[in-house]
Amino acid sequence: MRGSCGKSNAGRHLMRAALLWTGIVTGLAGYGASARAGTDDDAQQIEQCSRLQQAHIKDTRVELAQIVPAQSRFENVDGTVAVTSAPVCRVVATVSTAPKRKLGIEVWLPLDWNDRLLGTGKSGFGGFIDYSELTSAATRGFAAVNGDTGYKGSGSGEPGKLLDWAADPEALRDWAHLSVHPMTVAAKEIIQAYYGRSAKYSYFSGCGGVEAMREVEDFPDDYDGVDARSPGVYYSQLMQSFLWGAMLPARQPDALLTTDALALLNRAVLQHCGGAHALADGFLDDPAQCRFDPAELQCKSGDSQANCLSAAQVQQAKRLYSPVHNALTGELIYPGFARGSERGWAAIQHQLAAYYAQPLLASSVFGDARWDWTTFDFGADATRVDRHLSPIVNAANPDISRFAARGGKLIMTQGWADAINAPTRPIEYFNKVAERAGGVEGARRSFRLLMVPGMGHCGHGPGPTTLGGSSPPTEYSPDRDVVSALQDWVERGKAPDRFISTKYANDNPNDGVKFERAVCAYPLQARYKGSGSRQLASSFSCVEADAESAGVANR
């Protein structure tokens, strides 16, 4: 399960797309023509890999075990391509999680192995193998594993069509609880069979943030270090927040905040709360301090609509900034989005409700493919969802003591400009962990939370994005890469407090660095020193955040 979400027929860029293997361009025959061809080592590697098809792995059937040469291409359904940089032994397998339920996995075993396993996650509802995650991990020398969460799909649902795996309570429970653990157990056995030794350390990284947290909370022995990106740990409430964000435009179309309206609103927010620096940067350093009221943009008589918002649009903006509560119990369903996230609001106004909340709730709670999500009642229906779905799909247990006791380390990253998973939810989770751990320092012995200004969901956005995983870091060092930081923490005891995150020109590493920022582990936050270039991370220092800057204010 799947960090949070983000894909529709009109907006596949919102999630890490499902990567489906479409054939290796060079082909296995090409391996013999590579620079390593013709050597005894080649033949040995090919034989060693192919023997895995006869290996006895518990509850697992190996369907394919072949050497994949460097420069092999794996095509994404949206046309993007992942390319291997070195040969790997590619293992395709099926893991039985129940008599009639199976989990598809792939394990990639680099010939030059670093003695470590990296489990990887996926976005949305899953249903696919994420080859870009596998390629990235194997390139760094990790034995890598990724799974399809137990069904075949493209990461989202379709309005008016039931999700088979969500309509079956046992299959839904497997999807929520057994998407990562069985693939991890199988991967460790496959590693032992191939290399003749077990991994010294095991790590998990993904968006996929809920998958990551399920491992920390329920299967603490699987991984030594976990990188959880933008995790929607209150998953059933996240689905309800999608309905909240889309409800008013569905009932009152003139409330829709268009692309132009969102740009207008965002500029006003940046100007009001950050001035010239924020306008130049494109994001706020400290969104929790911002109190901009969208009513300031409401059209007055004679105003041009191009320069103001209608009354209905102002109402929609206020809804998206505001938390939604259960109308019967008063309990928080989900907090509002931070000021400065406005340019990412297109999907929350329709697509996330139609392609995620509607199919999942129709299948698992209401039992009717035709269920009309616009009739959702945030009292009775919200209570029903909490009763039937929350215990199954949520991964918000703040008791991570078993993981901490065995020396496990968790780094969670969350963008302040995330327009899918409201950013104060991870802060709330951290604070609950701290309550159980005897305070913030108790939590920080095993848990670091990184709140990244200007970053969207799992990267992206106007701010520095490399810590979110949407772009590679400038180097894989502990101060620039979360997995490297986990290795330093787990293996050498060096706890991280300050990172450097990068924004590339045009969001393309090939176009060079646009700017870099310091990112500090909560409750610290980066603050400009008052001198030096704002394009340099060295111009920012880590200081203690006050209550508002910690994200309490917009609750």
Set out the residue ranges of the language-model regions.
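A catalytic-pocket lid/entrance helix-loop region that shapes and gates access to the active site
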Residues: 213-325, 451, 465-478
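Short beta-strand/loop motif that positions the catalytic acidic residue
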Residues: 412-414
